[in-house]
Amino acid sequence: MSEQQTMSELKQQALVDINEANDERALQEVKVKYLGKKGSVSGLMKLMKDLPNEEKPAFGQKVNELRQTIQNELDERQQMLVKEKLNKQLAEETIDVSLPGRHIEIGSKHPLTRTIEEIEDLFLGLGYEIVNGYEVEQDHYNFEMLNLPKSHPARDMQDSFYITDEILLRTHTSPVQARTMESRHGQGPVKIICPGKVYRRDSDDATHSHQFTQIEGLVVDKNVKMSDLKGTLELLAKKLFGADREIRLRPSYFPFTEPSVEVDVSCFKCKGKGCNVCKHTGWIEILGAGMVHPNVLEMAGFDSSEYSGFAFGMGPDRIAMLKYGIEDIRHFYTNDVRFLDQFKAVEDRGDM
């Protein structure tokens, strides 16, 4: 039998074996049989030793062509097997579009987030800027720039988280006010609110947390009066607790304001008659406020004889607790889905 006839028969048999391979494993066995180191095509090269030298190049070329032909057929068959496997898998996994779809759980905004955004929206509408600041703050801005000297009780190590002697976790968002005023170089107006997290060395219980949120507001301009502060706070109370709410101002003391006041809102549950929410007083304390102390203005670079201002600070945690009847501040931070789902239901009713 001639070498040419041997290659022709080998090619035909290889094509038959390739077409009969029904899976990738069988196809791999065919490849090894013909193209492996000890395969049939490799065996043809052994015949070259018996050929005249002038015939060896042509014979070697034909062997390589045969190898390439078989490889091409193997590749084509491989692609066909992969396609058949995929089609079979798709046929077995046909989706019945008439079946009911899967319910996708949709979340809702956290009650604290809702409260903060509601307050922000109100003040944005009044022309305020929202300014954020550092949670790790310098003692200088957290206390000294706010008229709190080194000897003030609020600077006690038991009340604040100090990192170094001059660096601490901010105890309020007031440093944002101090930095903002300083950056204006004594030129008004300043009209900002400062939301953010603050830190106190409190023991966690139903009404206290070592970390909570705070929103403070500041207005500095010429001829700012106490009546401007009162009007702003009345608008805030009506927005948060209802249009029929009233406020009252009680004298208080804060180092950075003079005069200072505590702000109460008429009880939204008993309408001022007295209940467990307002402790039978008819009023609920919601925030502290006052006229910016002249020392604070001067330290920030403002001429206190020309400029005046008011400031206020509130805890969205407390506002949300009052508004939604939440009795424990820790619920805000435990990420209990059962608790949060209640606010999704309220949202669906359009009550929030």
Swiss-Prot record:
UniProt-annotated binding residues for Mg(2+): 258
Subcellular localization, as worded in the UniProt entry: Cytoplasm
Gene Ontology cellular-component annotations: cytoplasm
Cofactor(s), by name: Mg(2+)
The UniProt record lists the keyword Signal: no
Cystine connections: none
BP terms from Gene Ontology: phenylalanyl-tRNA aminoacylation
Subunit structure as annotated in this protein's UniProt entry: Tetramer of two alpha and two beta subunits.
NCBIfam families listed in its UniProt record: pheS
Protein name: Phenylalanine--tRNA ligase alpha subunit
Lineage, highest ranks first: Bacteria, Bacillati, Bacillota, Bacilli, Bacillales
